[in-house]
Design a protein with these regions (language model features):
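Long, charged N-terminal interaction/targeting segments
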Residues: 1-60
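Cys/His-enriched microdomains
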Residues: 71, 88, 105
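Short cysteine-rich clusters marking metal-coordination/redox-active sites
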Residues: 73-76, 90-93
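Cys/His-rich microdomains that often coordinate metals
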Residues: 79-80, 96-97
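Short Cys/His-rich "knuckle" micro-motifs
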Residues: 83-86, 100-103
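Short hydrophobic/aromatic patches at helix-to-coil boundaries
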Residues: 109-113
C-alpha cells in the first residue's frame, strides 16, 4: 500500500511548513492528485487517519481533488481529450497523445494556524 508512504511524505511536508511558519496546528490539507498516479483515495484517507495522530494535523480536514486524465494530439491539434479507456492513441488520426493533465500529485494548500 504505497498510499501510506505517500501520506507520510505529505504530513512531513505539512509539519515542516507549520514549523517554518510558527503554526501550532494544521487545520486543512488540500491535495490535487491525478488519475494517472493510481492512488486509491480510500487508502490515502485511511493513511491520513492513522498517521495524523500526535501531529499538528491531528484535527485537520483532508480534501482531495482528483484531476481527470486528459491529453492532446500533436498531429490534429485536438486538446483536452478525456482518456477514459487509457488508450494513448488519438481516435481521429491514430497519433500518440501527450498527457496534459492527470499526473499531478501536489499539496495545493495548507491552512496553518
Amino acid at each position: 500500500m504505497h498510499e501510506m508512504a505517500i501520506m507520510q511524505g505529505i504530513l512531513e511536508i505539512a509539519e515542516g511548513e507549520a514549523e517554518k511558519h510558527g503554526a501550532v496546528r494544521i487545520a486543512e490539507i488540500k491535495l490535487r492528485i491525478g488519475e494517472f498516479r493510481g492512488v486509491v483515495r480510500d487508502a490515502l484517507e485511511f493513511a491520513f487517519e492513522a498517521l495524523r495522530q500526535g501531529t499538528r494535523a491531528e484535527q485537520a480536514v483532508l480534501e482531495i481533488e482528483t484531476v481527470p486524465l486528459r491529453a492532446s494530439c500533436p498531429n490534429c491539434s485536438e486538446r483536452n481529450i478525456p482518456l477514459n479507456d487509457f488508450s494513448l492513441l488519438c481516435r481521429d488520426c491514430g497519433s500518440i497523445l501527450t498527457i496534459i493533465a492527470g499526473r499531478e500529485m501536489e499539496i495545493e494548500y495548507l491552512d496553518l494556524e
